[in-house]
Amino acid sequence: MRSKLLKKTLVTSLILAAIAYANYAAAHSAGATIDAAGNNASATDLAQVICYDDGDGPTDHLFVQIQDASSPVSGLLVSAQIYKDNKMTNTTDTVSGDANASPGTTLIGGNGVYYLSVSKTASGARNFTVTYHCQTAADVHTGTDITVFQVQ
């Protein structure tokens, strides 16, 4: 009886570990504070995301969404922009400091370097989390690396 319980517990633990690893392997997010001093309304953070075929197929697009993780401040919103090959898109977390992220946005640009920037609408420090995924046309996760250039 004890052996059955131990086996069941072990199998359950392994399944949960596999699920956690799969979610970790497919998810990319980064958090930071933009305008930590709270006095630069035009503060902008900048990173480069490199998308590549890691064996799951070539990248079709970069998916991005942003979440304001600070306390609510009326009129103070965070946005994320993606730029590649003379194309650009934007998404904004339209409710300051709630528990929901912005709508997702995608930029179709294939493999290569995408630029990801984060900005805000007014002075004031904002903690944010940006989620980003390089994906195939069928939304299968592809190779994704990030390098941060600027944190203001």
Give residue ranges: language-model regions:
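Sec/Tat signal peptide C-region and signal peptidase I cleavage site
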Residues: 18-29
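Beta-sandwich interaction modules
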Residues: 53, 98-109
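Edge beta-strands of jelly-roll/beta-sandwich modules across compartments, strongly enriched
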Residues: 45-49, 74-78, 122-147
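Short, surface-exposed beta-strand/strand-loop-strand elements in extracellular ectodomains
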Residues: 72-92
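Bacterial N-terminal signal peptides that target proteins for export
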Residues: 2-12
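Short N-terminal segments immediately surrounding and downstream of signal-peptide cleavage
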Residues: 27-45
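Noncatalytic modules at the cell exterior or secretory-pathway interfaces
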Residues: 60-62, 107-129
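Short, surface-exposed binding/anchoring microloops in extracellular/periplasmic proteins
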Residues: 39-77
